[in-house]
Amino acid sequence: MSVYNFKEVESKWQKIWKDNNQYKMDTAQTEKPNYYTLEMFPYPSGKIHMGHVRNYSIGDVVARFKKMEGYNVLHPMGWDSFGLPAENAAIKHGIHPHKWTMENIEEMKEQLNLLGISYDWDKEVATSTPEYYRFTQEIFLKFLEHGLAYKKKSYVNWCPSCETVLANEQVVQGACERCKATVLKKDLEQWYFKTTEFAEELLNDLDTLDGWPEKVKTMQKNWIGKSTGADLVFDIDGTDKSMTVFTTRPDTTYGVTYMVLAPEHELVKELVAGTEYEADVEAFVQKMHTMTEIERTAADVEKEGMFIGRYVINPLNGKKVPLWIANYVLVEYGTGAIMAVPAHDERDRDFAEKYNLDIIDVITEDNKMINSEEFNGLDASEGFEGIIDKLEKEGRGKRTINYRLRDWLVSRQRYWGCPIPVVYCDECGIVPVKKEDLPVLLPTDVEFTGKGESPLTTSKQFMSTTCPHCGKPARREVDTMDTFVDSSWYFLRYVDSNNENEPFSKELVNRWHPVDQYIGGVEHAIMHLLYARWFVKAFKSMGMVDFNEPFKNLLTQGMVLMDGSKMSKSKGNTVSPMDIIDEYGADTARLFVLFAAPPERDLDWSEQGVDGCFRFLNRVYRLVDELADVVKKDVEFGELNSQDKDMRYTIHSTLKKVTADLSEKFGFNTAISALMELINDMYKYKELDNINEAVIKEGVQTIVTIIAPFAPHLGEELWTMIGKEGSVFDIDWPKYDEKALVKDEIEVVVQVNGKVRGKLTVNSNISKDEMEKVALEDEKIKGLVEGKTIVKVVAVPKKLVNIVVK
């Protein structure tokens, strides 16, 4: 008997797949239905980790299974290859980011091929190549043309460690999402994408995503943060200016006793200019710039503020109330101003008590309005509507929907990102680069200092250009785009990755989208998944696509843990996939990550578990090797005895279960478990006397076919061992035989007073009455009920009989 040489087998089949371009998919094909399965593409760090192995193994099982089900399967891979690590490597090691990135891509690509993943490498994209980012730039220009990209000056999140601006989504509890440094505020002119333009669609269309985890949808709903209320206009006393405030409680407007502006609000500087308050206010504003959002707004942080010498007029009763600035009001939320109602808001009350400001109750405990003039006695809900009606008639307010979601800040002061394709002309202002002049290439003559302004400012050749409009000298934009821009449309490019004329063909992307199955970590719930959804809605509004959502179904796989902790280099608890592949083989590594836990749950690494999977694959190999000659025979079932029927039942019930686990849910672990039981039963069956060779043949062929998506190298090898030609993945997925699932005899449980007291083998067509009779006539049961009164007998057809006695 031969030995399973996994190294030889895996090397052999990887070469065959590559030489035959086995997984190339012509996206223009229309003969079969399409199925697009996609794992989130990685940043090319140079080494794959066990999280990658799990993610890509899940996607590969789906891709291979769907191909065998008769679909045209698109299963591409690429690289999210712009980003800070490459730039840091340039600073630290003196190697250009492009060289560092491309070397890492080649290394990771080789590792992915060693895993045996069925990628169509003809569709490969890398976001840092000019072939890709010229179209990222073209998309930017389309957004600019349609008013979805704009530039404005505002206070932004600044990471002093990364020395770049961050989007709101990249700040987690006041810290940089990447490096964990405390995030500060800076007043800068930056580029934005108008994500708020589609806030309502982003929110409402979550309800159409039945194939998404509720957790992810809830996270996005909370991030978008829809609030229904009103914008109220308060005139600033002694000026011709007014300020607008959004409130969800217009019914409390009579309780306003002071107003608060965010220290960074554009009105503050103007209102205190030349007054006795100017110097103190400026000092307070500067102090706020050194504090994080968490430090300013946490419930247990002391409220700080300052009166700025101005009053505003309540639009309902004409009363003047003092205008303050305070740490707990942020310029980026709402209008950057609040109407303070200390009687009915805890933060406002804390502030009012500290600074001795008035507190006026306007809502009673039973929700009735008081101290509210003509609205006294109304329910608060009635007052809500009545007050808005009054203010709308007077032009002092209007019903409004507000969102927590802010526009997406996309400017980054880094080198290794997509250049923003605009120039600045003293005559013409901001001018977009012409489409025919794309891509705007990253220069090579830059200095990587890691300090201050964008490295692009160090390239005079890059900076100096001519205006596309008037031809006079101009300077290029030196910021690059947030790398999340690149990853917000890559799934569309895969379908048409060699198109040199446009980002993608509308006809092709409509044919292949939305992506049928998207797989990646839950950590991308807010940023990547929200941005990708926004891009698709923007594209649809511009006529580039006809669908509303990028991803029909989403699986967020769990992490791979070591002793209950996340694997990380800093903890020294990582396991190298390459070491596992070298010692056990890729199929073993794949099988373990698929078998050890359901895909959406965290998986705890176990050397014993890996070894168990290795031994199982060897058992499969030995079984098929031993029975291969039988499989090659031309045999028929003939007359089947009970043991043959039992074996066929196991074969087809396993096939039914595995098919359901793969097509209806991601039950990889339970499918593999069923396969293991089938192998055990086949080993037992082959040792019996008078075995049926047709049953052996059917069992072995079924095993080879259904193990193939999980362990593709072994599947291919076993397929040839049983005398088959071509690839096992080119055959149709087998269909289970319903007749084989009908048993002549079944086992029923007999209970006495609810406790199991015996099991009986009976005819599968037995009636309820016959079940009761057989149970009562069983010698063991007779002894148990003797001398007792039988109260009742309950039979559950084909399952159990319960005899109640006293």
Curated annotation (Swiss-Prot):
Sequence motif 'KMSKS' region, residues: 566-570
Subcellular location: Cytoplasm
Main enzyme class: ligase
Principal location listed in the UniProt entry: cytoplasm
GO BP annotations listed: leucyl-tRNA aminoacylation
Residues binding ATP: K569
Statement: the UniProt record of this protein carries the keyword Transmembrane helix: no
Highest taxon, organism lineage: Bacteria
Keywords: Aminoacyl-tRNA synthetase, ATP-binding, Cytoplasm, Ligase, Nucleotide-binding, Protein biosynthesis
Motif 'HIGH' region, residue numbers: 42-52
Record EC number: 6.1.1.4
Single GO molecular function: ATP binding
A GO CC term attached to the entry: cytosol
Catalytic activity: tRNA(Leu) + L-leucine + ATP = L-leucyl-tRNA(Leu) + AMP + diphosphate
Pfam families the record matches: Anticodon_1 (PF08264), tRNA-synt_1 (PF00133), tRNA-synt_1_2 (PF13603), tRNA-synt_1g (PF09334)
Listed PANTHER family: LEUCINE--TRNA LIGASE, MITOCHONDRIAL, LEUCYL-TRNA SYNTHETASE
Family affiliation: Belongs to the class-I aminoacyl-tRNA synthetase family.
Record-given protein name: Leucine--tRNA ligase
